[in-house]
Amino acid sequence: MTARNSLTIVLAAGEGTRMRSSLPKVLNPVAGRSLLAHVLSAAPHGERDRLAVVIGPDHQAVGDEAKRVRSDAAIHIQAQRLGTAHAVLAAREAIAQGADDLLIAFGDTPLISAETFARLREPLHDGSSLVVLGFRAADPTGYGRLVVQDGKLTAIREQADASADELKITLCNAGVMAIDGKIALDVLDKIGNANAKGEYYLTDAVGIVRDLGLTASVIETSEDEVRGINTKAQLAEAETVMQTRLRLAAMAAGVTLIAPETVYLAADTTFGKDVVIEPFVVIGPGVSIADGAVIHSFSHLTEAKIGSKAQVGPYARLRPGTSLGDGAKIGNFVETKAAQIDAGAKVNHLTYIGDAHIGASANIGAGTITCNYDGFDKHKTEIGAGAFIGSNSSLVAPVKIGTGAYVGSGSVITKDVPDGALAVERNVQTAKDGWAKRFRDAKSRHRKPKAH
């Protein structure tokens, strides 16, 4: 049997005024990924699946994000915001191309899963013409109720229109829907706007399908999974749910989180085996951590690659472009950016390494700074394998420190250092006998008496 194809339409044209943000609502992040990106990543994306995203006329950034996440996404503009059904029909061209299953979702529900999208399609394969995603609300106030009889969906009843018995229903409408592609346009075109707001509501599709003598049904998911994000408070709630998911998944994969509730992960964080994450670690997007690595407390990592049995922190900041080789060590109060640090190299404390390549087993002393920026451009520092950089050294890029070379403590290095050489740049130390006493005596003579 040939697999059914699908078209998923993601509605992302909302203004999001309650977010009180200049950023379009669906671009706000949860676990380092935009709300929209979470939904697009969960939507079907096989060879026989298509994707359309409906955006507002003034939200080009939303379209750009959709294309970044899913290059196959077709972007459609809802010129006027006249309701959910009107938004779906903004993608009329995509619907008209045909699909076995039409899925409709919202760009502000980041917790929806690929598994739920798959389950939403199953009743269409078994004779239903329309499927609505529902959830059991802890407090159903304000939600549309799903009225079910004999296992079939008979109506979506908004709270203002619900009877006393219907108000007791806790099964609520999540807004996500699947429609048989053969009837989708016919059903959508029959939706009218004879209501107080003059808008076209997708929920009216249930009655239209039943009037056609066809079957509508419901599948259920958790309330968490269909949380819509309209305020910063709801954004924080979604972050909490997502972080719990990510932590549980990490621990199930063999990661040791010593205090899970204090560790923050990104949606794309990847781990090897036997990784240990100590309390109060923040991992941003683009981080991979290989087998046996340890991330000590109060470290912050973004777009960094951590090798096997490497160590980071405590109190380390790894910025984008950092790569640690196997067994490398980044210690306390070290910041790195665009830095390749090869196997076994050590940067133990109080150091900035930017735009640099540190060779295998090199040792970088406390207080070393790679001076990579001249006010206009960044420049690279190269430190050879086995090199030793003494404490409190400044390496003024562009500069190369040779294999096995030494740099004496306190040096300001502006020229390349050959392999195996020692480079020292200091003024001659002098000592002036008796100077301290003369200084104190002079200060005492000029000091004003203290007031009593």
UniProtKB/Swiss-Prot annotation:
Residues of the active site: H349
Oligomeric form and interacting partners: Homotrimer.
Enzymatic reactions: alpha-D-glucosamine 1-phosphate + acetyl-CoA = N-acetyl-alpha-D-glucosamine 1-phosphate + CoA + H(+); N-acetyl-alpha-D-glucosamine 1-phosphate + UTP + H(+) = UDP-N-acetyl-alpha-D-glucosamine + diphosphate
GO biological process, one term: cell morphogenesis
Binding site for UDP-N-acetyl-alpha-D-glucosamine: 11-14, 25, 78, 83-84, 144, 158, 173, 230, 319, 337, 352, 363
Binding site for acetyl-CoA: A366, N372, Y373, S391, S409, R426
Renumbered residue ranges of the record's region N-acetyltransferase: 254-452
PROSITE patterns to which the protein is assigned, alphabetical: HEXAPEP_TRANSFERASES
Organism: Rhodopseudomonas palustris (strain ATCC BAA-98 / CGA009)
Family statement drawn from the similarity comment of this UniProt entry: In the N-terminal section; belongs to the N-acetylglucosamine-1-phosphate uridyltransferase family.
GO molecular function, one term: UDP-N-acetylglucosamine diphosphorylase activity
Top-level taxonomy: Bacteria, Pseudomonadati, Pseudomonadota, Alphaproteobacteria, Hyphomicrobiales
Protein name as annotated: Bifunctional protein GlmU
Region entry Linker, spans: 233-253
